[in-house]
């Protein structure tokens, strides 16, 4: 009897302990939810106040300039300390100091090389920074200097890459030598930019070419008609809309659209031929792409070499400066509350990946 009573008492105590635990956990969750809600509410108020205060202020970026010679020097010194013994290090240090002293005494002024980067998406969004970087360097660059653009782009919108190319043309017009380095891809609009360089250097397996124009869009008119849905397209002007997504496309509209593509292609060919007259433009303007090895034979590039190799060589005889214009992020972008910005970047990211494979 006593053993049975003890077992029942322990069972009741265990049951009470579990209930108390559940109640405590529920209260804790409720408290945590209230705390999170309060913190979020405070953040929303602070962000709103900051946004109202910053409204109307002009957002400006900042030009960042780094000397690449220091980077290469650090790599060299790191290798020296890892490989050489104390005596060899001492001798190397003396030799470097002596060479620097002789250069200073002789009054030798090394030419400057301004290094830019362009990583292009469909909209050539990097043009926003490129235009300011070019404006900045042209205030200092001389015909004895050089501009090196490390270019990566599979192309995109005609007008966007037309503007990016026009920015590079400013360098040529100023009489400053322009070298284009391509490590992975410069196709379609990317090659439109590359051809402006006085010298084009590519990696052996970089993808180049795609001198052509493409446009594609779906048409759901028959689907809408099947479900008795009308979609009106009203225009003023015979060719205001040639092809549409929802309206009924006509053969006349298709012919006009194709004519516009051909016109754009001819302008593209003329632009490339203007800057690289050595090309057989009709032979290479077929929309095809070539790897660097084959592109060299067709004179699409002038030399096979990676950008790393080229810059390391130039660092031995010139002062290298890397320029990057960083756009000032808006408050919404910094806090991460702008869903439309995030969505836009997500879509552009995936379209760019597709673009790199199809070379629009």
Model-assigned labels for residue ranges:
Residues 5-9, 14-179, 184-186, 199-203, ...:
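N-terminal organellar transit peptides
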Residues 190:
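DNA breakage-rejoining catalytic core of tyrosine-based enzymes
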């Amino acid at each position: 009897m006593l053993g049975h009573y003890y077992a029942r008492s322990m069972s009741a105590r265990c049951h009470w302990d579990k209930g108390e635990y559940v109640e405590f956990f529920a209260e804790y969750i409720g408290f945590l939810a209230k705390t999170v809600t309060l913190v979020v509410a405070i953040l929303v108020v602070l962000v709103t106040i900051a946004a109202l205060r910053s409204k109307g202020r002009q957002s400006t970026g900042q030009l960042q300039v780094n000397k690449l010679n220091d980077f290469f020097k650090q790599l060299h010194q790191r290798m020296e300390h890892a490989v050489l013994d104390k005596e060899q290090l001492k001798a190397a240090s003396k030799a470097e100091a002596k060479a620097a002293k002789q250069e200073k005494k002789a009054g030798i002024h090394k030419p400057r090389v301004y290094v830019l980067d362009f990583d292009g998406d469909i909209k050539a969004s990097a043009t926003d920074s490129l235009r300011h970087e070019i404006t900045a360097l042209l205030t200092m660059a001389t015909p004895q200097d050089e501009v090196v653009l490390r270019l990566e782009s599979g192309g995109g919108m005609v007008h966007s890459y037309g503007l990016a190319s026009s920015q590079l043309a400013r360098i040529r017009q100023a009489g400053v030598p322009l070298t284009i380095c391509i490590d992975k891809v410069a196709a379609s609009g990317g090659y439109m930019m590359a051809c402006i360089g006085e010298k084009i250097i590519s990696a052996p397996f970089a993808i180049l070419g795609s001198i052509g124009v493409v446009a594609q869009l779906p048409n759901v008119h028959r689907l809408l008609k099947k479900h008795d849905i009308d979609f009106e397209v009203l225009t003023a002007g015979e060719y205001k809309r040639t092809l549409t997504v929802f309206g009924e496309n006509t053969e006349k509209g298709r012919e006009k659209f194709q004519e516009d593509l051909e016109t754009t292609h001819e302008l593209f060919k003329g632009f490339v031929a203007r800057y690289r007259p050595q090309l057989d433009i009709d032979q290479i303007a077929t929309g095809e792409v070539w790897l660097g090895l084959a592109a060299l034979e067709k004179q699409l590039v002038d030399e096979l070499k990676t950008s790393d190799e080229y810059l390391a060589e130039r660092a031995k005889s010139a002062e290298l400066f890397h320029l990057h214009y960083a756009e000032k992020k808006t408050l919404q972008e910094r806090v991460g509350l702008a869903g439309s910005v995030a969505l836009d970047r997500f879509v552009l990211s995936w379209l760019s990946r597709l673009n790199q494979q199809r070379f629009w």
